Amino acid sequence: MSFVEFNNVTFGYKEDDYLLLEDLTFSAEKNDIITVIGASGCGKSTLFRLMTCLETEYKGSITINGKTPKEATGTAAFMPQKDLLMPWRNILKNVTLPLEALPMSKAERISQAKEAIEKVGLSGCENKRPSELSGGMRQRVSFARTLVQLWHGRGLMLLDEPFSALDSLTRISMQDWLIGQVKGLDATVMMVTHDVEEAMLVGNKIFLLSGRPVKQIKVIDVSHITCREDLYTPSSVELKNELVRAFLTEKAERGDNI
């Protein structure tokens, strides 16, 4: 059994008059690093909402490590698009937040939060407020908070466009930083992105969503791309152009923005 399985899943939001997903089947294996791309509104983030029980009215079956999303509540460590740091809490207290509902002492929470902060390269910033940090540093804090969730029995990390709000130079720096972070994890990682190069660089597989509703996912192996220089080989450039053409075709067919 795969770590994540969608079997014949059909879903649409009640306020919409169309389906986003129809009889969709796919799987993700343990320790896969998957980047999810597709046109705006095609259902990328919806996959995460289904896996985290934020949406529960669907047909078909979804399992995470053999359990339904409801049974597996808390299995996924989730990093949203916006960092959602609490401005009145310092960095240490922001990172300890997911641990406060767990049966552990304050000393244990602080110790684990400090370890996560160290792993993301922000030691010495524990007492700073979010407003004192740059955008890239705030995203590192958000990742540290996601790490402490992952350490408590969660085998799945979901990253929803974590760098979309950053400027281009910070984004490139954070992409290179993230690669080193996720490849050392004992977890299945799925990341939504609109950036084709980011998808090719961070993941070992790309899930390409297209159509409305999405009926199948095209899986593309990019495990041969291990560093930024690999993006400029002839085969990688050809793949990038193919993915961009797929985006443009989808845009033309739907008549909306990508």
Label the predicted regions.
Residues I37-A39:
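The feature captures the beta-strand-to-loop junction immediately N-terminal to the Walker
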Residues T52:
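Helix-to-loop junction immediately C-terminal to a conserved catalytic motif
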Residues K59-A72:
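Conserved ABC transporter NBD signature motif
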Residues R89-T96:
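Short coil-to-helix segment of the ABC ATPase nucleotide-binding domain corresponding to the Q-loop/switch region
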Residues T96, E100, A107-C125, G180:
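Conserved ABC ATPase "signature" region
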Residues L122, E126, L147-L150:
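ABC ATPase C-loop
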Residues R129-M137:
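Conserved ABC ATPase signature
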Residues F143, L147, M157:
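Hydrophobic anchor residue at the start of the ABC signature
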